[in-house]
Amino acid sequence: MSIQEKMANILPHTAGVNKRGHLTIGGCDAAKLAVKFDTPLYIFDEATLRGTCAEFYKEFGRRYADTLVIYAAKAFLNRALARIFKQEGLGLDVVSGGELSIARSADFPMDKVFFHGNNKLREEIELAIGWGVGRIVVDNLRELALVNQIAKKAGITQDILLRLTPGIDAHTHEYITTGVIDSKFGLPIATGQAEEALVEALSASNLRLIGLHVHLGSLIFSAEPYRKAIEIVFGFAADMRERHGFNLCEFSPGGGFAVQYTQDTPAPDIAHFAQAICGTIRSKSKEFGLKPPRLIVEPGRAIVGRAGVAIYRVGAIKDIPGVRKYIAVDGGMADNIRPALYGSKYEAIVANKVNQKLLERVNIVGKFCESGDVLVKDAEIPRVVPGDIIAIPVSGAYCLSIASNYNASLKPAIVLVKEGKALLIRRRETYDDLMQFDVD
């Protein structure tokens, strides 16, 4: 089996191998891009981005016509990607003033922006309301009062959703589990705090409560948590209708859809989640006598993960006979913290030796001053020498968005590839960039 076949489910849709035995993405030679733009380098495939956006609308839209897909910007956002999502008809889920600013700088339609977050700052809420965001997803009682106060001062009525915690364990990593009662996010249904917030929202002078939101976590491989959450939330909505006259006009089950990172961790396709979510919304709406609400779906990783590939250059090679061989590259935990933070697993490809036999099992490690700076454990690769190019697929989500300047390193450049052309969409940092905010 060729590398191309072996990696078929994790490489971008346009990936291939050229006559030189080099990995290609979007018709561009990855090794040549490493020379042109230097390394570390992140490559995003435009066709994969657009194709995945279209697939979400296709799979959810054909099962539930009143669907809006909004991209979860925390996975990674810059202006170039925001413009693509705008063109594909998506909305944006943002969680900070910074993400709001990126959206605005890309002329993203603010009425399709949903502002999330468990501790929104006053100035962030003022920006959001001033710029006309479509929805503020209220996370707690303090925020509810604050949003109403700011909306009143601005002389508007702000549409809001309430974020609820349904008390469901999505069985993912504890750091990315968000739907349980013991969570910093949301208003628990079981404790009565969700009802308290709902009553307060309905009586607020400058708020319009139009829906409910849940988010269960990230990297969820089963549709069952979504089914359970919908049943709980729709039951709550029906109860609130009877007790307080609340009408559920919009509902979001969040995102968190898993993607495949390695050959031994297959993930369900989009259709699997769409069928479960849309079917359950229909059945539970009927069961509880609710008018089917508008569906808001919030994929992040599931849109950008596979579209991104990280490119590194091999430097030092350390072979400890009978123990292990280490291949050090010029990036690592500063641009991809996920292996160190979550124990995340990746595959690796030697981009300039794709067709060569896999002769070695090695650890691919970064250049940073931590023993935990390991990008790929037990990677099966051809024999490499300094200067070879390592590609790590499925690097589009939660790598660059969590990147740091650890060890005063420089954040990498990013290119967008399409039909043999590579567009620089973020330049590499310089040493002057590192010091630009220092005050002597």
List each model region and its residues.
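Hydrophobic face of alpha-helices
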Residues: 50-53, 230, 274, 391
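A charged N-terminal "starter" segment
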Residues: 1-159, 195, 203-208, 419-440
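Active-site loop/helix belt of alpha/beta enzymes
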Residues: 2-5, 167-316, 381, 407, ...
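Active-site-proximal loop/turn and secondary-structure-junction residues that shape catalytic pockets
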Residues: 75-77, 98-99, 119-121, 140-142, ...
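Charged (often Lys/Glu-rich) extended helix/loop segments that serve as interaction or gating elements
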Residues: 34, 276, 282-285, 290-440
